[in-house]
């Protein structure tokens, strides 16, 4: 697979599903089989370009501790996802999963070469820790915005109390006004919808709503909510 990259990628496109099943069912050899898996990613120049988990790790930032992925029906949808905004800002690669089975496989692996595998829509990602420590730049914010924003968060939290777990300031959003993220340990929305298709009684879990205090729409809402 390593020495004949093009030939292996052709093989993977034809028989990759079989190897994926091996990762899922052959627990003893799952780490070896995981080396044979191939993915597209945010750093790939085209939807046809593939890379291995080992190649992903080799390209990780020096202080990056986790492997990240996002799941959607196609690459175009993932490119527009608000979950990717912080990754673009930090220039961190994200694996693109379009096969519904891929996320089950990666969540089953848990880690690769001692690097935890995490979905980009999870609440507490390691790459967000530095953002938590940064002092918020308030130079372009309206006067007395801090109190207005806190009041807006409380209002939204009360309004959506029966539909969300929490409402808080986001440290991942750059361009979008808000997003919903999964609490730790909860499958992604994509996987939960797949589960719901086979189990009508399955209820999709409540999410955490994150609000981007820098977004103009949020600032206007805060002013109107005063």
Model-derived regions, located:
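Conserved GHKL (Bergerat-fold) ATPase module
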Residues: 1-226
